[in-house]
Regions:
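A short beta-strand-loop structural module common to alpha/beta enzyme folds
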Residues: 24-34
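N-terminal beta1-alpha1 ligand-phosphate binding loop
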Residues: 1-21
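Anionic-ligand binding patches
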Residues: 2-3, 39-190
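Cofactor-binding loop segments of dinucleotide-utilizing enzymes, especially the Rossmann-like FAD-
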Residues: 8, 28, 109
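Flexible, glycine-rich phosphate/dinucleotide-binding loops
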Residues: 12, 32-34, 113
Length: 190
């Protein structure tokens, strides 16, 4: 029996690798836009997307699905389509609190057996246009693959005045609860 990560996210692979988890990564087959179109609550969206990704891989292997959602001033944000939209997002985020919700689900045989969601609040500092351009010069296109236009493990940490919440949740996966769930199922040593 294998453990599968239904994700193409580099940071989620890095988190599992660093924790010593053996897994195989596959691209999930999920219509994210359709799911997001019928939901409005960030926690519900992240949880449903994580569950859908975990259910998307057929067979008897355990499958991890995970997703993150960013909301600022009541508005949900997707990954930017291009650098210009990334700059627009950053200008909108400036001097506002950002809520980042990450969820993770564990499924087997197309059925979710366990899930967990967590949120963090990140206070975006006041960002000048010059900073935004310099930041994107250094971080684009990598931040184009993230919903908040930042990588906390890189220059993205400079966007914030204060961060309240779990580090792993902010990186994109509530890792500590997931590791506990894997141990409970005998997928990691206890």
């Amino acid at each position: 029996m294998s453990l599968i990560l239904a994700s193409t996210s580099a940071i989620r692979r890095q988190l599992l690798d660093s924790a010593g988890v053996d897994y195989v990564a596959v691209k999930p087959d999920v219509d994210e836009a359709a799911l997001k179109a019928r939901l409005t609550d960030p926690t519900e969206i992240a949880s449903e997307l994580a569950a859908a990704k975990a259910r998307s891989v057929p067979g008897d292997d355990w499958v991890i699905g995970s997703d993150s959602v960013v909301s600022v001033a009541g508005r949900l944000f997707d990954k930017p389509r291009d650098r210009a939209e990334a700059a627009e997002h950053l200008r909108f985020f400036s001097a506002k609190p950002m809520r980042l919700t990450s969820a993770v689900a564990l499924a087997r045989g197309g059925r979710v057996d366990w899930s967990h969601a967590d949120s963090a609040t990140l206070q975006v500092r006041s960002l000048s246009d010059k900073f935004i351009e310099t930041y994107l010069d250094a971080e684009w296109p990598e931040v184009g693959y993230t919903v908040g236009v930042f990588r906390l493990e890189a220059r993205g940490v400079q966007l914030f005045d204060r961060i309240d919440g779990d580090h792993f949740t902010i990186l994109g996966m509530p890792l500590i609860p997931l590791l506990g769930a894997l141990r409970e199922r005998g997928l990691l040593q206890s």
